[in-house]
Amino acid sequence: MLRSLVGSEMCIRDRFRMLWGYTKKMVLADNMNLYIKMVYDTPAEMNGPNLVAATLLFSLRLYLDFSGCCDIAIGAARILGYDLLENFHSPFEATSFAGLWQRWHMSLTGWLRDYIYIPLGGSRCNVVRHMLNTLIVFAVSGLWHGADLRYLEWGIACGVISVIAQLSKAPRKVLWRYNPLYREPAVQTFLQRCITYLLFSFTMVFFASAIYNAAPGEVFAGILQGWQGGFAAGWESVTNLATSSGIDGRLPVV
């Protein structure tokens, strides 16, 4: 009887996980994608605030989409009696860029570590070789996502940030130690998570450009230069495009 109750509770839990996965993917991620796609389809017509908002949302949208699919697959597999490995572990709770990658798409990062990074020598070599190994692994990760130069640029950008983070680890520790915020662990953790998310989102400009067939240069130019008129002016461009595309009823009016 006890075994039956436990099995029933696990089945309910797995069904809830599948439901949460569908919610993340179809309710949250797909609706975010409406706005992001509008912005990235015509980056030259958008201003800085909207490009920044779309880029920051894209990182969250990608996580909700990928992790939602994983939740559905893991929940369904457990109902059938199979255990699948977890693929995401709260990546945006990471306080460093390296920590985020230890929590993001763990099946891919584990494969890259075991079959490329470690055979190349990993961190068991001199500093220059170690940094080169890091760049190679991230470049391969970019090409794994697709045969597009923008995916390769995304991988290289991730690799460069990882290398800089590793080389600046000691100086950053000193800076944090003498920073007044160091005495407030909660504030320090919050700021580190925000910085990590911003860095990750910066690299995602290349990834999003590959998905929506945009030019990364136009996106970065708009982010750096297009702040005239603020968010409202850019939102007007988005709603005008939505109206002309016949999907204005699916976008919120502000």
Q: Each predicted region: which residue ranges?
A:
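Positively charged, low-complexity/disordered segments
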Residues: M1-G7
